[in-house]
Amino acid sequence: TDEATSAYEQIVLQFPEHPLAADAQYKLAQAHEESGDFDEALEAYVTLAATYPRSPLIANVMIRISDHFYKNEEFPIAAEVGKKFLEKFEGHQFASRMAFRVGQCFYKAEKFGTAGESFDLFAKSFPDDELAADSMFWSGESFRMANNDREAFRRYNRCRWDFPASDAAKYARGRLALPEMLRQFEAEANSVENDN
């Protein structure tokens, strides 16, 4: 791949204004990535974004960068790249996947409140997506891990009501049987009685 890297570098250097120069820059970054040198790949991706900011390849660049940091368990960085992606490319075909990934990143980084909010945003932004039930369950999990039983209880119930046939609803029903969720059920029932 040294030959490929060299060839792409030559194209970018000799023909920076050519319509395919951005493609060559992207291929250069991929060649570095495939050879295991992500630092060089990252530099080439950043150069692509800076030099060709209108390139349709920018979305792919951001996905690859976020993926790299996710796979290397650098979840806060992966989440930030994902959030920037969603700001720039909200209508992209992979926007829902990236939005879900942002929630996963915050959860794995143990930023549970932010994870819950991210999964809620996913459910609001992509209500018909195949991951909508999972996002509601994971919102519940996130809030439960943040010791916010009230919000967790509500997300588990919403998952169960809105997506009754899903695997996520099955897991949500299991979580609702936890002692802290049963206590929350009693607290909510008592508050309804007291309001009447």
What are these regions (language model features)?
Residues 1-196:
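Acidic, polar-rich low-complexity tracts and alpha-helical solenoid repeat scaffolds
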